[in-house]
Amino acid sequence: VAGGPGLAALRLKEIAKGRAEDPLQRIGELAPGERVLDATLGFAQDARVAARLVGPDGSVLGIESSMPLAVLADASLRREGSAVEVRHADSGEVLRGLPAASVDVVLFDPMFGRALASQPGFEMLRRLANPSPLRADVLAEAQRVARRVVLVKAARYTPMLRNLGLRHEHASRSAPVVWARVRAGSGRPIPP
């Protein structure tokens, strides 16, 4: 279903069964009660997982610059009864308007240049999404706003992380997606 839980549903089942540690647990170390800002909401896959991990005492705000995607994600999340708050806006503008250290974690998952085999609905998402890459000035604002860490997700093949001076966390050679952790306020990647 467009805008539906998709791969997040599988990730949530794995978390519930205790079988696998999700990247948001392993790399982001999300914990109950934390405040998360998903700066590139898309279909809200990561926001759904983050909401489960931070629980009812935490909060997740999803920012989406594409109006159609924001509407689809919001409708789907409301149908599910999710506590994720959706806001249609430019994430850079939102971040600039927030006080320093006002959220625990900022998450970026910019649009991948091409589909990964495991991503159903990617072509529709790409047609609706903002294709702009993550900019260094927006990353710097995220570091200012995050109390603990900024997470950046990217396709393994893309030079985006390297272009931002980031290194990805250890991942299996076959993993199509990699994550980088950036210490809040430091401007430096967290050493693996």
Question: Each predicted region: which residue ranges?
Answer:
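S-adenosyl-L-methionine
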Residues: 1-35, 39, 44, 63-105, 172, ...
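Residues at the starts of beta-strands that form the adenosine-phosphate
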Residues: 35, 58-59, 83, 148-149
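Conserved SAM-binding loop of SAM-dependent methyltransferases across substrates and taxa
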Residues: 43-57
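A generic alpha-to-beta junction signature in SAM-dependent methyltransferases
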Residues: 54, 99, 144-146
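Mobile active-site "lid"/loop adjacent to the S-adenosyl-L-methionine
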Residues: 106, 110-138
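Conserved Class I SAM-dependent methyltransferase catalytic core
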Residues: 135-183
